[in-house]
């Protein structure tokens, strides 16, 4: 599942598990070799879910780099997508390790909710200034809401919708985003967040179930 990247990084000496939506793959010369839509696939969800569960089992903090607008629309993926998405959501919701989400691009609908959003337990959610957070893309939303409008009217309505429903400022006002950070300052804020969460202690019935599952797997 090359559309979902997982791995370990170091932030000020701390080991952090990173999960990211991948849109472009570059070769050794720095040229684009492969491109993906920023959507969730069944294989990508399973890959991320297993990685998050692994990190949680060993109390490794998790960082999510989110840029997702929906789901992969193909027969093969759709057969398994619901189960895989539930697995991913459960992994994030049940994980008691520190969880930080950075929105780097688009974050739309239930696909975003599953990618370590506030709704399923992210400790901190940061976003870049040009990020988009909402139920759906403004252009698609206005085509549904104003089906009979002209192209010029749709363009105007899309701007209004984007300002009211899709901007990162609106998401911050509603509590979905904790802080809007400049890309150049991102590392500093991530380090601060994980240092603050270093002694995090969380207990829920869900986390206890996951803990017992981890113990079973490890033994």
Cite the ranges covered by each PLM segment.
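Ligand-binding clefts of soluble mixed alpha/beta catalytic domains
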Residues: 1-212
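A short, hydrophobic C-terminal helix/tail in secreted or cell-surface proteins
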Residues: 213-219
């Amino acid at each position: 599942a090359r559309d979902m990247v997982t791995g370990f990084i170091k932030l000020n000496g701390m080991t952090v598990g990173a999960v990211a939506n991948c849109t472009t793959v570059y070769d050794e010369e720095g040229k684009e070799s492969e491109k993906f839509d920023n959507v969730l696939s069944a294989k990508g969800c399973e890959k991320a879910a297993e990685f998050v569960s692994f990190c949680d089992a060993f109390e490794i903090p998790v960082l999510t780099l989110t840029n997702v607008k929906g789901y992969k629309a193909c027969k093969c993926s759709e057969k398994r997508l619901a189960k895989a998405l539930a697995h991913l959501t459960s992994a994030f919701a049940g994980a008691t390790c520190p969880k930080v989400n950075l929105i780097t691009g688009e974050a739309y609908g239930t696909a975003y909710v599953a990618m370590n959003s506030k709704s399923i337990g992210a400790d901190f959610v940061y976003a870049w200034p040009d990020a988009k957070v909402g139920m759906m893309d403004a252009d698609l939303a206005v085509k549904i809401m104003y089906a009979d409008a002209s192209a010029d009217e749709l363009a105007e309505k899309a701007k209004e919708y984007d300002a009211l429903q899709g901007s990162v400022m609106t998401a911050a006002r509603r509590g979905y985003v904790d802080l809007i950070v400049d890309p150049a300052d991102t590392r500093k804020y991530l380090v601060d967040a994980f240092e603050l969460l270093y002694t995090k202690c969380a207990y829920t019935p869900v986390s206890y179930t996951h803990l017992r599952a981890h113990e079973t797997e490890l033994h």
